Amino acid sequence: MSWYRAASVGRRLVASGRILAGRRGAAGAAGSGMGNSTSSFWGKSATTPVNQIQETISNNCVVIFSKSSCSYCSMAKKIFHDMNVNYKVVELDMVEYGSQFQEALYKMTGERTVPRIFVNGIFIGGAADTHRLHKEGKLLPLVHQCYLNKSKRKDVE
């Protein structure tokens, strides 16, 4: 299965520090160039699972490692969707070497469960942690900081 079919890819647009437009599943970055690759590198032997995970995390402000039938994963995705925040989803049960990626995530985060959620390159936890950060008003500022950082890096280039 291709990366595009296995993951939802969203657009990222930034204007005055506010995230605009785009919905989960929409392809392309509308010229923003902010890590919306639809290339199929998942499972290629030349790159280790950890390297592939790290590349995905560094190229996207929000990454959710999920399983398609997981209710906690759905809850986490809904939080970002309801905040109109775009995110990349990697459905581990739909990629060829999903169990190897889940093992790599375990080594990186200390947990085998899904979802495993990264914001601004930082592991923030699972669904309960994401819900708590959202209720405390801390989740959206983390996302905004990522978009600001990416915008600054793009200006420097």
From Swiss-Prot:
Annotated residues for binding of [2Fe-2S] cluster: C61, C146
Swiss-Prot/TrEMBL keywords: 2Fe-2S, Disulfide bond, Electron transport, Glutathionylation, Iron, Iron-sulfur, Metal-binding, Mitochondrion, Nucleus, Redox-active center, Transit peptide, Transport
Signal peptide bounds: none
GO MF: 2 iron, 2 sulfur cluster binding; metal ion binding; protein-disulfide reductase activity
CDD domains per the UniProt record, alphabetical: GRX_GRXh_1_2_like
Positions that bind glutathione: K67, Q102, V114
Record has Electron transport as a keyword: yes
Modulation of this protein's activity: The 2Fe-2S present in the homodimer leads to inactivation of the enzyme. The 2Fe-2S may serve as a redox sensor: the presence of one-electron oxidants or reductants leading to the loss of the 2Fe-2S cluster, subsequent monomerization and activation of the enzyme.
Residue list for modification S-glutathionyl cysteine: C70
Domain Glutaredoxin: residue ranges: 50-150
NCBIfam families referenced in this protein's UniProt entry, alphabetically: GRX_euk
Function: Glutathione-dependent oxidoreductase that facilitates the maintenance of mitochondrial redox homeostasis upon induction of apoptosis by oxidative stress. Involved in response to hydrogen peroxide and regulation of apoptosis caused by oxidative stress. Acts as a very efficient catalyst of monothiol reactions because of its high affinity for protein glutathione-mixed disulfides. Can receive electrons not only from glutathione (GSH), but also from thioredoxin reductase supporting both monothiol and dithiol reactions.
Family label: Belongs to the glutaredoxin family.
PANTHER family (alphabetical): GLUTAREDOXIN-2, MITOCHONDRIAL, PTHR46679
Protein name listed in UniProt: Glutaredoxin-2, mitochondrial
Native source species: Rattus norvegicus (Rat)
